[in-house]
């Protein structure tokens, strides 16, 4: 179904069954598969392939040579019915690739809202990306990576499969991430290590002075004491009773499976 207000260049191929909502603009030489749905006011520049079971929300901008929803690069994949879901207001720049999920994961690769993926970013199968994230040129995510809200990842950074990146994290360019990165932290290097807190980012996003001070205290517990992760977790729970924002640390440590960067 193609809405009558959609604008589609005659050189583009839209397979029967695709759903194109109102005021979508599809430029030249695009291919849209039969199981694709594209939300209102989304713009496809040119030379874009969207395939598989792919749902794209409203007001996204997708640039040339992007490939979305294609078969993943997991050798176990046997053409099972898996998908990708993309929210609203995302900018997906040139040559970005986002692959469909696997049955070993949750069958879905999921992108939130208001993200910027710069040139040549690769998001592998089963990744879950939150909202308001920025990934600079040539960032590569392995399978099953989770990136929480308001995270910034510098160019040429690679993140190992199954890693979790906490909210408001900033990762410097050319880093290699092989373990989980707790919330609010600046990390850099190969392998990535912590370099303090993303204080400037917290201020820009309106965190109160008391919350920032509490986050500093939590960082000292986790990284400036001799505590094990388990004993640090108990100390953080006590701090969270007075400052609920610290529950971000506690919940993250509970979720972590690969261990945290130290």
From Swiss-Prot:
One of its GO terms (molecular function) is acyl-[acyl-carrier-protein]-UDP-N-acetylglucosamine O-acyltransferase activity. Keywords: Acyltransferase, Cytoplasm, Lipid A biosynthesis, Lipid biosynthesis, Lipid metabolism, Repeat, Transferase. Homotrimer. Its EC number is 2.3.1.129. The keyword Transferase applies. It catalyses: a (3R)-hydroxyacyl-[ACP] + UDP-N-acetyl-alpha-D-glucosamine = a UDP-3-O-[(3R)-3-hydroxyacyl]-N-acetyl-alpha-D-glucosamine + holo-[ACP]. GO terms for cellular component: cytoplasm; membrane. It comes from Blochmanniella pennsylvanica (strain BPEN). Involved in the biosynthesis of lipid A, a phosphorylated glycolipid that anchors the lipopolysaccharide to the outer membrane of the cell. It is found in: Cytoplasm. NCBIfam families: lipid_A_lpxA, PRK05289.1. This is Acyl-[acyl-carrier-protein]--UDP-N-acetylglucosamine O-acyltransferase. The keyword Transferase applies. Pathway: Glycolipid biosynthesis; lipid IV(A) biosynthesis; lipid IV(A) from (3R)-3-hydroxytetradecanoyl-[acyl-carrier-protein] and UDP-N-acetyl-alpha-D-glucosamine: step 1/6. GO terms for biological process: lipid A biosynthetic process. Belongs to the transferase hexapeptide repeat family. LpxA subfamily.
